[in-house]
Amino acid sequence: MNFKIYNISDQAKGNFNSGEILENKPIGFPQDGGKLKPYSNLFYWAHAWTNNKKSTVGLHPHRGFEICSFVLRGKINHFDTKLKKWIPLSKGDVQIIRAGNGISHAEEFDKNSEIFQIWFYPNLEKSLKKNASYDDYSFSDFKIRKNDKSSTTIIKGDGSPMRMDTEGLIINIHDLKDGSHLFKSTKQKIHSIFILDGEIEIENKNILKGTFINISQTDSFEIFCNKKSTIFEVISPLTPSYKTYA
């Protein structure tokens, strides 16, 4: 099993508007200086939040990528040049911009709000020729699978309405009770996991809130929770079938 840990200190840092919006970036831009570079069909992953003041990232352009925002806490408002109106999003909601041949957007963070923004690689040779499109998904749109030890919100995968052109993605949020949890995989997949809350253990290594890990080249792995924990998981191809520039 290939298992790597990226602590908060290993992640790139960023901010907007003189620190009104703060960021840790498990996968940053090349100039950001974090330890982890793009891989699989993941190009960029930012964990962004505000404290006691709302703040806006002004209108800026995108092309090619599929850019997803996952609202973890609070509220954001989104504007783009496709819909030409502000759209509110709350905790648990997800937005996707299929940037295609070009779109510009702006984001307003309410105070005490928190998101992931993740850029995924579709096949750029195809996506750059498509018109841009945009969808919002409410938390209530997503299927939740429960058992005695965990609850899993399926954001992208079996039974999810979320449409993406990026190949081979599964996106889950797992709420895990204390104890042992077995995750199945294949050697063709890589699991990218962010610890949203709590504390977990893998191969006798203690992993705290805010830490990012990836796991690959295994048919299964075990996560032990020392207490109730929440993790955000993206499963993607170890080697996509198309060029990604990663």
What are the language-model segments listed below?
Residues 80-98, 201-225:
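Short acidic-glycine-tyrosine-enriched beta hairpin
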Residues 96, 106-163:
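Surface-exposed beta-loop interaction hotspot
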Residues 183-185, 243-246:
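Short conserved micro-motifs at the rims of enzyme active sites and ligand-binding pockets
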Residues 61-77, 119-123, 173-176, 186-201:
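Short, conserved beta-strand element in jelly-roll/cupin
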Residues 160-214:
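Hydrophobic secondary-structure block in the mid-to-C-terminal portion of proteins
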Residues 99-126, 206-208, 216-245:
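Ligand-binding loop in jelly-roll beta-barrel domains
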Residues 15-59, 66-67, 115, 141-182:
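A short glycine-rich, His/Asp/Glu-containing loop-to-beta-strand
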Residues 12-14, 30-110:
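Extended, compositionally biased flexible segments
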